[in-house]
Amino acid sequence: MKEPILVMMAAGMGSRYGGLKQLDPVGPDGEVILDYSLYDAYQAGFRRVVFLIKHEIEDAFKAMVGSRVPAGMEANYAFQQLDKLPEGFSVPEGRVKPWGTGHAVLCCREFLDAPFLVINADDYYGAGAFKLAYEYLRTLRGKRGEYFMVGYALKNTLTENGYVSRGVCTVNEFGFLKEVRERTHIIASCDGPLFTEDGEMYRRLPDDTTVSMNCWGFTPDFLDALAEGFVPFLNEAMENNPMKAEYYLPTAVSRQLDRHRATARVLTCPDRWYGVTYHEDRAVVAKAMLCKAEES
């Protein structure tokens, strides 16, 4: 049987932080976040990785990261291209924004012939997340319509440096995902996490609220569902928001769940999540990575 695959989404540029986050060193010896994720993934059992990047960063990315892929780990590169669209569609004049995370995974399709995990390359999920994911992926061989999400406690994902957007999850009594609701303005406070919808009135969220940090696992048939949903998305996007509409991975998952075509197990990770949303977050991540290096 083919081994589980790790997909690392490295095509994005941080809109608020600025710059190519994936290649910004945070470790004591110049390591980037992606290096730590690769190490943890390898230790968990992953032996295949697909990097999703843009053609524009290919040389810089391969020079910095390609040579640091663990020995014994097969690496492939896929490219998120704006004009990689279904027959009958073309890129609207003036559009430069990528089509979103759902489209990004579709761009990796040629390499995804086994259950796979999708993560952001500029986020650090913790060793526990990769162990949970790898073991669960191994149970999905030959199955269809069985997805999962690695969830985190909201308190373990916040920054002191500004507001964040988080997918707040509703989980049923059997541990399956019912809904992901995007909260676009959550802040950390002395009273705990607070969110606002209008910028004026803030409401409390429990510390242990399960949130999605875009760490998803899928059986290969999900790619058919992604492709199927991309067409109606494009039809609507071309009419209503041709410059900025994005096809999000959670939207495609919700579509499958709503139609009872799939289930999504929620695997709870106790680790802290680290990411660089704001420039000031880099120091926090660097400190955490130094501690990790000293422990290992």
Task: Mark where each language-model region is.
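Short beta-strand-to-loop acidic/aromatic patch adjacent to the donor-nucleotide binding site
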Residues: 114-124
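N-terminal glycine-rich phosphate-binding loop and ensuing alpha1 helix
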Residues: 2-66, 75, 80, 114
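Short phosphate-binding loop-to-helix
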Residues: 69-115
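A C-terminal functional module that forms or caps the active site or interfaces directly
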Residues: 227-261
